[in-house]
Structures are given as structure tokens and as C-alpha cells.
């Protein structure tokens, strides 16, 4: 059984501020979810082949087709900053 103190601790670690009502609600909801997982763990799946999907699905994405775009200047004109033929963006990683 999930205790309210456990929900409060996880909320604190996640930097979430819960009201008393939310804490009670999440304790009940998460407890129900954990009970369901407990039921699932009782199933005999020894004969079930491991899979990542419930149904067999093949690649459903479309094929990418490269389409040249010759008006590079108009795209670069929209950039807040550029260098030569490239977008210039702020550095996000420090020196290592």
C-alpha cells in the first residue's frame, strides 16, 4: 500500500508543491496504478515472446525526398544572426 508520506517525499524531490487534496488524490491514484502492476506481475508470460509493441507494425513513415532549395539568401535573411552561408546560434556548451 502506498503511503501519503511517500507521495509527499517524491513530490518534494521533484520540486512539486502539492496541496493536501492533491496529495491525497495522488496517493489514491498511484496506489491504484501500483496495485494494477501487482496484478500484471502475477500473469504467466513464460510462453509469450518479448516484444516492444502489442501489434506487429512496420515502418509507417513516409520516404524522405531531398528537394533542392536555391534561394538560400531568403532563408538566411530570416535568421537573427548569420555567418557566411550558415545560421549563427548562441553557444550552448562550454569548453571541455
From Swiss-Prot:
Q: Tell me which positions the record assigns to the signal sequence.
A: none
What PANTHER family does the database record attribute to this sequence?
A: GLUTAMYL-TRNA(GLN) AMIDOTRANSFERASE SUBUNIT C, MITOCHONDRIAL
- Any one GO molecular-function label of the UniProt entry: asparaginyl-tRNA synthase (glutamine-hydrolyzing) activity
Q: What is this protein called?
A: Aspartyl/glutamyl-tRNA(Asn/Gln) amidotransferase subunit C
What is an example of a Pfam family matching this protein? GatC
Entry-linked SUPFAM superfamilies: Glu-tRNAGln amidotransferase C subunit
Taxonomy of the source species:
Bacteria, Bacillati, Cyanobacteriota, Cyanophyceae, Acaryochloridales
Catalysed reactions listed for this entry: L-glutamyl-tRNA(Gln) + L-glutamine + ATP + H2O = L-glutaminyl-tRNA(Gln) + L-glutamate + ADP + phosphate + H(+); L-aspartyl-tRNA(Asn) + L-glutamine + ATP + H2O = L-asparaginyl-tRNA(Asn) + L-glutamate + ADP + phosphate + 2 H(+)
Its family? Belongs to the GatC family.
